[in-house]
UniProtKB/Swiss-Prot annotation:
Residues 113-134 are annotated as: Disordered. It comes from Thermotoga maritima (strain ATCC 43589 / DSM 3109 / JCM 10099 / NBRC 100826 / MSB8). GO terms for cellular component: cytosolic small ribosomal subunit. GO terms for biological process: translation. The keyword Repeat does not apply. Residues 120-134 have a biased composition (Basic residues). InterPro entries: Ribosomal_Su5_D2-typ_SF, Ribosomal_uS9, Ribosomal_uS9_bac/plastid, Ribosomal_uS9_CS, Ribsml_uS5_D2-typ_fold_subgr. This is Small ribosomal subunit protein uS9. Keywords: Ribonucleoprotein, Ribosomal protein. Belongs to the universal ribosomal protein uS9 family. GO terms for molecular function: RNA binding; structural constituent of ribosome. Pfam families: Ribosomal_S9. It comes from the Bacteria.
Amino acid sequence: MAEVVGYYGTGRRKTAVARVYLRPGEGKVKVNGKEYESLNDYFKNPAWTKHAIEPLEVTNTLGKFDLVIRVNGGGLSGQSGAVRLGIARALLQYDQNLRPVLKKYKMLTRDPREVERKKYGLKKARRAPQFSKR
């Protein structure tokens, strides 16, 4: 049995985790075991789709790979960021020469921003209860 050539990358953003497999192909997309025409059918919002496939666009590899993505946790926005980082890391496995391009567009950097925890005595992380003088 022939070994299937594939490239793997993991991405995280907020509480979302994406495991991305790139396989040489013609641009098919499979997210969480379900086939999609494009990533836009999964993310719905074109901005999130554009954000997720940006690494493929800047490296001119759009349509050269089939995407198999397992993503869970967070909302669609966080998942989009996680998929983006996963694709970028998988592209590095495919070709190390893409590193300067991906680095230039800051696609290899994990966004460290997380939700700040709620503190007791406050309504939210920083929102204090309304103050009344009388």
